[in-house]
Amino acid sequence: SISCGESCAMISFCFTEVIGCSCKNKVCYLN
């Protein structure tokens, strides 16, 4: 997986979801 450069440790949500990223292991990754 490619890291989207966004953390989701505090909230289990990625603002980068709009470009196809999702939260995995407290980091946002591109699927």
UniProtKB/Swiss-Prot annotation:
It comes from the Eukaryota. InterPro entries: Cyclotide, Cyclotide_bracelet_CS, Cyclotide_sf. Disulfide bonds join 4-21, 8-23, 14-28. The keyword Disulfide bond applies. Expressed in leaves. This is a cyclic peptide. GO terms for biological process: defense response to virus. Pfam families: Cyclotide (PF03784). There is a cross-link at residues 1-31 (Cyclopeptide (Ser-Asn)). PROSITE patterns: CYCLOTIDE_BRACELET. Keywords: Antiviral defense, Disulfide bond, Knottin, Plant defense. The presence of a 'disulfide through disulfide knot' structurally defines this protein as a knottin. Belongs to the cyclotide family. Bracelet subfamily. Probably participates in a plant defense mechanism. Has anti-human immunodeficiency virus activity. This is Leaf cyclotide 1.
